[in-house]
């Protein structure tokens, strides 16, 4: 593992000075290599899916793991989208001239070596690698055992693309073992080789990393997203948004887990809950809702803080936007919250009083995604308050330097 760290550090010094044209060529070579090896990648994924069935993984977990031609094409498209993004390295973030004539610029620079620890999503292999590459960083990947074959097939194709572009193969390395001890070694930083760790996985994985990491991390513990439906909301709009936010893909961190409804308009919005039930979604709700919907289950305290990642949703009535804000402040993970309302004063209050990384108005929580933000792809979502917050794209994978130019100044 420490040898991987040394190799990554050497590769990072090469990547840091690569031109935009060189990096974009490498990304195109990676896309072409993924296309050329798509059959091998899908066969490897099929093996992971067979193992998942034998290991009794949930439907949501299998969906996270699954690749098909459409999803693989989406991954390949995302590589080309990253190539089209502006190169952050060398961008002047700000500049000014001091009274003594010194000209000071704050300039974006690569972070160095990024450690990516993830579980069952094969696409993270490519998303993380290409974003790191675009930002001039080397990466060390450690995928989960569920996606072991898929991740390695994707990485193999990626490295072939790197070689064709003349890039060091050690720019993107993958830990070739399922041994969990490798994660512990990465969390120690590999003797100073790793600059940042980005975890992408379940609550237990991220919690362990947050406790054990000896290097900085960009992470969120869980999704636990909320939608508040105000009495001023349009019923049809609210129904479409809630159905999408819950059921488009239930197993992703931006899926809504709790819906809060303005108590004064409960009967107006009951058709939303009926529509969810018709789609096979289980409703766990407060007593006033269960009274009107006998098929719904009574919610318990633990439901408000539970990330289901399944076709289950908690529903609660609240006294206006103030009640929604109070509930979200108590239970939110700080990931994503949405308000459906036509009253802009209510919307402004919602936005001004909540501190989650992403706030939406009249839109599905499932837009909490780097691709939807125009970032091309994302490594993950960060809910901390450092410079990387929300979707982690190429800009968030950079640091900065101060470049100071003078003409002989000395300090008095």
Curated annotation (Swiss-Prot):
**Record localization:** Cytoplasm
Major subcellular site: cytoplasm
Domain of life the protein comes from: Bacteria
- What are the BP-aspect GO terms? L-proline biosynthetic process
UniProt enzyme class: oxidoreductase
Q: Which family does it belong to?
A: Belongs to the gamma-glutamyl phosphate reductase family.
What is the name attached to this protein's record?
Answer: Gamma-glutamyl phosphate reductase
Please report the organism this UniProt entry assigns to the protein.
Bartonella henselae (strain ATCC 49882 / DSM 28221 / CCUG 30454 / Houston 1)
Q: What is the lineage of its organism?
A: Bacteria, Pseudomonadati, Pseudomonadota, Alphaproteobacteria, Hyphomicrobiales
Gene name tied to this protein = proA
